[in-house]
Amino acid sequence: MKISSAPPEANYTTEGTRTVSNAKISYTLHYEKDSASSGYISETLMNSMEVYVKSIIDHYFITYGFNTPMLRTGDTSYQIYFVPGLNSNGFTRRYSKSSSGEPAGSSICINYPPSINTTDDIKKTIAHEIFHSIQYAYTSQMGFTGNDKWFTEASATYAGLNYVNKYLSYGKSHANKYLVSVETPFTDISNNRSYGMFLFPQYLSQTYGGLNSIKRTLEYVSSGYPVLKSMEKSAQYSDNSATYGEIFAMFQRCNADPRRYVNSNGQYNEATRRLDNVGTASNIPVLSTSAVHYGLKASSTTSAVSVTVNITSGSYTNAIFKLVKFPGDGGSSVYVNYKPTSTSFTIYVSSFKTGTTSSVYPRLTLVASNTSDDYTTSYKFGLTRTNK
C-alpha cells in the first residue's frame, strides 16, 4: 500500500497505522504509538477510532452514495492523521495538481489528543472533515470559491451535526453568530460566520429531503450551477414549484422563530431585530442573501396595527415579506406571506394586544428578505406603523 508524503503536522516518534474500508472507499489512520509521546494514542482508543471512521464512511458513501474524494496520485487509500497541538479540532488539506511536488488529492488531520474530549465531538469532527474532502470531489478539487465560499464551512458543519444528530450541543454558538448578523450577506464570512450558516443547509435538509438534498446540491454544483441555484434545483425534487427566493424567505421565517429548527429545543437566539417599537423607517437596504427583521410589540392601549411598506429603490420583484405572529400563550408562531405586486402595500393585524391567550399577538416580527440569487442585487424599503 503506497502512502503519499505526510503533512508536516504528523511528526510521529513511532507511527502506527490502521486501515478502515467498505465497498466504496478505504482510509488509513495514522497515530502515535510511543507511550512517552504527548500525542500517544492507545490501541484501545484506536479501536474506537476505527469504529467511528467506519460508521462515518458507511454513512456518507454507502447509505447516501456521495462521490468519493480524489485519491492522491499512487495512493490506494485516503489518509487521516491523528496529531496533537493543532490550532483547531481538525482540518482537511487540499492538494491541487499545481501544488509543487505534491500529487492532487487531500489529507485530513484530527487534533487528538487532548482537545477533543467526548465521543460525539470526535465523531462530529471526523464527519466534518471527511465532508470537506467530499466537497472537492464535486468541485474539480478546487473547493468552493468566490461568492460560494460560504458553503464550504456551512455545509461541512451541517454534515457533522447531522451525523451526530446533536445540533444544540455543538451548533448553538455557531448558529447564534449568524443569527446576530442576518443583515450581512453570505459573502462576508468573517468571524467564523460561515459555520453558523449551517442553518441554511439545515433548513433545506429538514424541508426538502434530508441529507439527500445536500447531495443533490453538490451534484448540481458539479454540473456547473452556482450554490444557490443548485439548492433551488435540489429542492425541486421534493417540490417542483420551489424557488430560491421562497426557500430563502422561509429560512428567514425560521430565523425569526428558531424553534422551527429540528432539535434546536427553542434555544437558538431569534435573529436580531431592529427597534421593536419603530414608528417609521426609511431606505433600509436589503442585500442579496440577507434579510432585515423588524420587531413590533403591543402595549396595553393597542388592539390592532397597520404597517405600510414602501420599496424606495431597487425592484419589488426581489422582495418577500413574512409577518411572523407570536401568540400570547407562547405557542407556535404563525406567519402571513406578502409578495409585493407594486412598490407599496399595507399589512393589517387585528388582535395586536397584550395578553396570555392564543388568540392575541403581543409580539410580531416583520421579515424582509432578498430573493435574488446573484449575490449583487439589492433593494431598499421604508415602513410606517400605525397603532389602532
Where are these regions (language model features)?
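A generic structural signal for beta-strand entry/edge sites
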Residues: 26, 105-107, 344, 363
